[in-house]
Amino acid sequence: MKYKDLRDFIAKLEAEGELKRITVEVDPYLEMTEICDRVLHAGGPALLFERPKGASMPVLGNLFGTPRRVAQGMGEDSVAALREVGKLLAFLKEPDPPRGMKEAWRALPIFKKVLDMAPKIVRSAPCQEVILEGSQVDLSQIPIQTCWPGDIAPLITWGLVVTKGPYKERQNMGIYRQQVLGPNRVIMRWLAHRGGALDFQAWQQAHPGKPFPIAVALGADPATILGAVTPVPDTLSEYAFAGLLRGSKTELTRCLGSGLQVPASAEIVLEGYLKPGDEANEGPFGDHTGYYNEVEKFPVFTIERLTHRRHPIYHSTYTGRPPDEPAVLGVALNEVFIPILQKQFPEIVDFYLPPEGCSYRLAVVTMRKQYPGHAKRVMLGVWSFLRQFMYTKFVIVTDEDINARDWKDVIWAMTTRMDPARDCVIIENTPIDYLDFASPVSGLGSKIGFDVTHKWKGETQREWGQPITMDNAVKKRVDEMWDGMGL
């Protein structure tokens, strides 16, 4: 099933019992978070708060609160089907050279489909049905959540931030949280290596002192939202990838005050600029780590214009100790990552990012070991191959007989197949998430890899133990006897 816009997706979820309308008044200050958190922990539906306190605009929460809804947003019926999305991305990232004309012809439709998914520019866009400018812009009219008691201000969480560097042909789209400072000012919290921050840095070098155009789309269609958080190859735009998921071109429209292009069906669009040197302290806010983050300076986004659809819906989320919505997204996207990694490292059998590890800080890899030191090659490959794993602090690599998703299995392997001195790889002074206060320096810390594989000659002088298993014939006889034993 494909969805042309957010409202189409909402209607489909509601028809399936996957969305619940909340008709009682609920306060965006803390109450929505508590309700969403309880429902998410129970694996419940997406929530549409129709009567947010102090505003007339409904709030959509927990949209991607189960892995299946993430898969549905990508146009798939099951989480398992996301492996096919990963295979497509793996192919587009590094296409295999055809071994003959037959293979070349088979690959041609894929490339044609990608080329056919270039975004379509439309002049008349739903996101510009209502236009507010200058003093009319007032973020207090949007029921922006304050998620936790220690949060300093309301926080925009699901904004798709659109930027364009001075020397780039293509726009960048990323999701960065934004602290509300006033009616038309928010703080743009992006880390230095992110696409938006790099565009801003390049702009300041090319146009010193001049305002940097920026746009934020809220409430885009699910394929576009998920395209912004998926490891799309650098050669493919997020909009083209969203088109592949949706099965139709992403419709964009030009901002009224700049050349930036935003999803035409978005519920709300914020247009404005960053002025070099205009910065403010951001935070503290409760984060996906389960802690409040440190206060840091980030640039201020001044909103000149706010456009929206008639009767707009505000799309929001909260972050906290896992499981939260980002953790659920991580569970689903885990299935997309696997084929991408296997394309580069065919020896990988499974790859798992436990949600309780903040969805990216710890990875468990199972592999078919082929030579001494092989596990160390794989762990180094995980850290370096995809930028999504730049902040993964712990990588556990073990054999294919271990279930990467069963902690009992993993811990048994760690305690029986590892020597701490021989099998730990520690790398110091590597990039670390700025939100990781456990690192000695902000943004810089260490990583550790655990070789939990059976050891080959050259890695050990000991005779390696053989796992205990019951004889299959005995197991079959006991199976046949079982019902008669009354056990």
UniProtKB/Swiss-Prot annotation:
Membrane topology per record: Peripheral membrane protein
One example of a Gene Ontology biological process annotation: ubiquinone biosynthetic process
Pathway, per record: Cofactor biosynthesis; ubiquinone biosynthesis
Signal peptide: none
GO molecular function: 3-octaprenyl-4-hydroxybenzoate carboxy-lyase activity; metal ion binding
HAMAP family: UbiD
Function: Catalyzes the decarboxylation of 3-octaprenyl-4-hydroxy benzoate to 2-octaprenylphenol, an intermediate step in ubiquinone biosynthesis.
Protein name: 3-octaprenyl-4-hydroxybenzoate carboxy-lyase
Gene name tied to this protein: ubiD
